[in-house]
Amino acid sequence: MPEVWKIDFYIGDDGSLPVRAWLDTVPQDVRGKVLARIELLRTGGPTLDYPYTSQIEGKLREARLRVGKTRYRVLYFFDEDRTAILLHGFTKATAAVEESDKKIGRARMASHESRLAARTGQKTAPRTPAKENKRR
């Protein structure tokens, strides 16, 4: 039986669910396609690769979907509980992921890891400089 991974939405300090809120703004016919792409993480886990997902930097990855000329992305990472945490959803306007989107993803990932460490009593893992994690 293949391993099944968990998927969860990042929860903001104020209790918000930013990816769920973003999904509410996506056209209804596309929303199901975005959710289907995210569902692939359940069975593919961290080994699910291009064209479905790609690495942004370090543990930060993007779930990828193109509908017509529009590119939809959801930034996520797998936490220590073996759960894909959906961090940030956006419509991609350029070939590369904008630094502002990466910054949001990194901040939410750090927030989630900090809360997870506080809950489990563990220290968070030291960060590897982003430039060392870029694709070769």
Stretches found by the model and what they are:
Residues 1-71, 80-84, 91-136:
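Basic, Lys/Arg-enriched alpha-helical interface segments
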